[in-house]
Amino acid sequence: MAKHSSFLFFLCILLSTILSGCAIKKNNHSPTFIVHKSAEQRVAQLAQINQWHLRGKIAFIEQRKDKKSKRESATIAWQINEKNQTQELNLTSYLGINVLNLMSENNQHLIKVQGKEYRGNNLAQLVYSITGLTLPTNALSFWLKGLPYQSTDQVKLSSKTHLPINLTSQFDNNQWQIDYSKYKVFDDIQMATQFTIKKDDLLIKIVIKKWFLTH
């Protein structure tokens, strides 16, 4: 009888230990809650970032006069060093073919397309003359971070998260509308991962898979 009681006692201790271990393991996977910073705090954080790199997808959808839309899609890899005033941008087709390679330093731009090289100091104009694509890179480097490009730009913030949900901006004598959605935390900063950018009959859609931010 004593042996039977000892066995039951040992079994209870063993089960208690296993259950405690499961409870501890479960707690280790408890969800983390995001603390939303004020708009000023987020802008201050972004001001400390002097290098950034993103990877994702981009699509250009243009409504033509014949009412047929023209669509161009590519994967995008873009890195900027604001301190050194350099950047590199690559657009690649879904088949892995490099569509466009851009390298810039001190506002001097080199674009390589299909083995040919093109140079200039007006980047948006240079891209358009080569590819027919409207890519407002100067302003886009601000817009993607949810920052105004011009002092007259208007940023609309979410009342709950204090994050940009809409931005109205002026670039190249045109008004652009930028909408933000699906924020994720990268290097302790909430960054949008989906964008729609509109101007007249042009719609640019961007989905970012990964942000890399460096102080």
What are these regions (language model features)?
Residues 76-80, 101-104, 180-185, 210:
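Extended lipid/amphipathic-ligand handling interfaces
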Residues 55, 71, 84-85, 99-103, ...:
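Beta-strand-dominated lipid-handling architectures at cellular/organellar boundaries
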Residues 125-160:
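Solvent-exposed helix/loop surface patches that form functional interfaces
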Residues 146-215:
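Gly/Pro-enriched, hydrophobic low-complexity segments
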Residues 58, 91-95, 104-106, 115, ...:
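A mature extracytoplasmic/lumenal domain signature
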Residues 22-77, 81:
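N-terminal leader/targeting segments and the immediate start of mature chains
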Residues 86-134:
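An acidic-aromatic
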Residues 1-24:
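Sec-dependent bacterial lipoprotein signal peptides
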